[in-house]
């Protein structure tokens, strides 16, 4: 980017704005919207979306408009979830000018911010409006259909009652197993496994999604609630070190369990300073994210910044979370450990199973039932568009309070409100998958949505 060109950068969070302003070139001025400056108002009858100005945010809107007049470039860097999309769209409408761009924040390092400022795309507010209206249309017509439950309840029913892809299983004694690859099976299917005697197998440690981190933060007692865990993760993301102004971790709201190719290269160069290059995963084992994916996995920006070296700058809980993320990332980039025991199933050749809770567990055979962990649930619901990473912690706590689900040892089980609808699980799964695809349709009509809902 041309650092002499005056750029107006618009973000959601005042904390982000303060951190980023220190690291940006002097020619970049940052304004935080502090959430919604407008509230969405959807007219289902006319299929129109309006942005109704929040009177308490008048000063922010005024400043955005005034600064935009002087700026050579305007960049909106909000989340890629529906809330972030609405903020980007409403700001673009306020400015009523072409050439507004959108950027994606990957991390709060100086290099990360400069990279974001250079790698921006023209904001297509018409396309954004269509996508937003489609989501509002789907939710509006769903809520008016008396034959359908709450859309989130339907999503949970589809996860627990329909055939899905599983990577976690429980044996007869409640010991949690993991499979080397996902298996397509029914939720009540029994999978018989027996010891593998001919091949050596290894643990599978993948890079971290938001869902994985929140699961671990609650399990490790860094947080009492999942929403608290999400706030803790956000706090860690916004933390910069006093002695260097360096940020600690990458973007905290992501469904990815993979790194970009350039991140793998950076990690490799960093790790060489700590250990041997021979200890790193070979390329064929690396989880590589698509270059056009909005975000990659969560990881420490500098492996040379070890947990013990920053412990004095971090309070207890953020420090413990950083330590956990750091050590998990090291495991995910280095050669996997050999398993003492692994199990196979005749109907799924090439896939092996191993116990997660107790690696000394050994029996001649076992019967495994598919199960859904906290992180599995997040991944599944994100795929159907029901729940994005940014809302996962808060929503999970709400479902627990409502008695829709129970969670024990990270395994999620459905309760009566979900169980009572299991006979329609496949139908809900089909409807939700179809609607999620149609949400990107530029010519989606109410008639099309009604037809899908009635199928």
Say what each PLM segment does.
Residues 151, 162-169, 237-268, 289-308, ...:
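Catalytic phosphate-handling regions of large nucleic-acid enzymes and associated NTPases
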């Amino acid at each position: 980017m041309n650092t002499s060109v005056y750029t107006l950068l618009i973000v959601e969070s005042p904390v982000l704005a303060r951190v980023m302003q220190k690291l940006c070139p002097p020619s970049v001025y940052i304004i935080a919207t502090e959430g919604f400056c407008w509230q969405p108002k959807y007219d289902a009858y006319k299929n129109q979306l309006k942005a109704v100005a929040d009177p308490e945010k008048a000063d922010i809107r005024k400043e955005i408009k005034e600064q935009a007049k002087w700026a050579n470039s305007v960049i909106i860097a909000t989340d890629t979830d529906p809330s972030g999309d609405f903020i980007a769209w409403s700001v673009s409408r306020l400015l009523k000018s072409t050439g507004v761009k959108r950027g994606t924040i990957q991390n709060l390092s100086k290099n990360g911010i400069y990279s974001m400022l250079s790698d921006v795309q023209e904001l297509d507010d018409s396309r954004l409006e269509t996508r937003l209206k489609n989501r509002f249309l789907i939710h509006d017509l769903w809520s008016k259909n008396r034959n359908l439950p709450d859309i989130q309840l339907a999503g949970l029913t589809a996860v627990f009652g329909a055939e899905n892809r599983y990577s976690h299983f429980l044996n007869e004694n409640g010991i949690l197993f993991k499979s080397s690859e996902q298996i397509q099976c029914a939720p009540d299917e029994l999978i018989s496994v027996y010891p593998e005697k001919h091949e050596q197998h290894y643990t599978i440690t993948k890079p971290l999604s938001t869902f994985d981190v929140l699961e671990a933060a609650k399990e490790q007692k860094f947080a009492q609630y999942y929403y608290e865990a999400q706030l803790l993760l956000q706090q860690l993301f916004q933390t910069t070190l006093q002695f260097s102004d360096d940020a600690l971790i990458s973007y905290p709201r992501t469904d990815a369990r993979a790194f970009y190719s350039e991140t793998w290269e950076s990690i490799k160069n960093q790790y060489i300073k700590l250990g041997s290059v021979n200890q790193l995963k070979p390329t064929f084992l690396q989880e590589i994210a698509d270059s056009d994916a909005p975000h990659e996995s969560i990881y420490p920006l500098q492996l040379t910044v070890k947990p013990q070296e920053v412990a004095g700058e971090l309070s207890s809980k953020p420090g413990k979370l950083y330590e956990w993320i750091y050590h998990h990332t090291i495991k995910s980039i280095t050669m996997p450990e050999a398993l003492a025991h692994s199990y196979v199933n005749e109907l799924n050749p090439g896939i092996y199973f191993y116990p997660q809770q107790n690696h000394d567990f050994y029996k001649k055979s076992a019967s495994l039932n598919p199960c859904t962990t906290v992180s599995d649930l997040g991944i599944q619901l994100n795929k159907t568009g029901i729940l994005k990473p940014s809302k996962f912690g808060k929503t999970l706590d709400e479902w627990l309070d409502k008695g829709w689900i129970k969670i024990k040892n990270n395994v999620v089980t459905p309760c009566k409100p979900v169980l009572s609808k299991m006979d329609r699980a496949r139908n809900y799964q089909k409807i939700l998958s179809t609607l999620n695809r149609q949400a990107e349709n530029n010519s989606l009509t109410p008639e099309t949505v009604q037809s899908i809902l009635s199928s």
